[in-house]
Amino acid sequence: MTKVMVLSSGGIDSTTCLALAIEKYGKENVISLSIWYGQKHDREITAAANVAAYYQIEHRQLDLTPIFKNSDCSLLKGSTQEIPEESYATQLAKAEGKPVSTYVPFRNGLFLSSAASLAIIDGCSIIYYGAHQDDASGDAYPDCSDAFNQAMNQAIYLGSGKQVHIEAPFVANTKEEVVKLGLELNAPYHLTYSCYQGGQIPCGKCGTCIQRAQAFSANNAIDPALKGETNESV
């Protein structure tokens, strides 16, 4: 029996990842893990809990907020920066080869390492997470790249005594392709939340809102978030 721990932010990518894990391994073998890190959009944790409840799987939560106390990343509550209201392509053009301002320092590395500890304790041999090609493009989020995934997988596999490895099933896929798969799997997108501003109604202007809208449009699908549906209840 293979048990899987899925990093779940309550957004499109991680919810599709969760749907894929459940399809492949069965919901009785899947645990969802969500992490608080001081994000402005902590509404996403409610979304992740609702998605887990929808699938009737165990949902764990972990608070790593203190680690980022001194970070001025625009995604965090303590930041003096505003979240950019423009596409990632526009942000990258201004970044001069550096990650975008919403890049949280080594966030995925920290999340995966923490998940590895919990996975060993819970008897999970695989950690799933929803990094995809678009997030890694231009090094907007370097901890979403295939090279990073391979390096972290090797470190976790060896560091866990070969008990745990990680899989990023979408690392070679675009957001459009992720949404296509999610629609095929009937992922509960009506329960998801993505906006970096953290308001009840998505702003439609931040990088992740723009990217999400483009992915649904490319699939000729209407985003439930734009139909007035919310993630407040299952």
Spans of features found by a protein language model:
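ATP-dependent adenylation/nucleotidyltransferase module used to activate substrates
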Residues: 1-186
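Short functional micro-motifs and their immediate structural scaffolds
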Residues: 26, 188, 211-214
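Iron-sulfur (Fe-S) cluster-binding modules
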Residues: 35, 233-234
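Local cysteine-cluster metal-coordination motifs and their immediate loop/turn environment
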Residues: 109, 113, 193-214
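Glycine-rich nucleotide phosphate-binding loop and flanking beta-alpha elements
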Residues: 135, 216-217
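Short amphipathic alpha-helical interaction/hinge segments
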Residues: 160, 217-220
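Short, intrinsically disordered, charge-biased short linear motifs at domain edges
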Residues: 182-184, 189-198
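Short cysteine/histidine-rich metal-coordination sites, predominantly Zn2+-binding motifs
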Residues: 198-199, 220-231
